[in-house]
UniProtKB/Swiss-Prot annotation:
GO molecular function terms noted in the UniProt entry: structural constituent of ribosome
HAMAP family the UniProt entry points to: Ribosomal_bS21
Family per record: Belongs to the bacterial ribosomal protein bS21 family.
Organism: Rickettsia africae (strain ESF-5)
Superkingdom in the source lineage: Bacteria
InterPro entries: Ribosomal_bS21, Ribosomal_bS21_sf
Record has Ribonucleoprotein as a keyword: yes
Recorded GO CC terms: ribonucleoprotein complex; ribosome
Keyword Ribosomal protein: yes
GO biological process: translation
Pfam families documented for this protein: Ribosomal_S21
Protein name (Swiss-Prot/TrEMBL): Small ribosomal subunit protein bS21
């Protein structure tokens, strides 16, 4: 359960903090993944593709840092 404190009736900052906490908990990603049933084979393929994407991103970042 996500709790957010409201200070002095400031709803804008409270909403901003709430959205930030949801993103940290990966709530939106979980909702997107659970929207439709994904077969185990499709899940494996997706995870391999995500790992490859992360590796490319890390390699690009490392290349520009040097």
């Amino acid at each position: 359960m996500i709790l957010v404190n409201v200070h002095a009736g400031n709803c804008d900052n409270t909403l901003k903090n709430f959205k930030k906490k949801l993103q940290r908990e990966l709530y939106f990603r979980k909702m997107k993944e659970q929207r439709y049933y994904e077969t185990p084979s499709a899940k494996r393929v997706r995870k391999v593709q995500e790992a490859a994407r992360r590796q490319r991103k890390f390699a690009r970042k490392k290349m520009f840092d040097e």
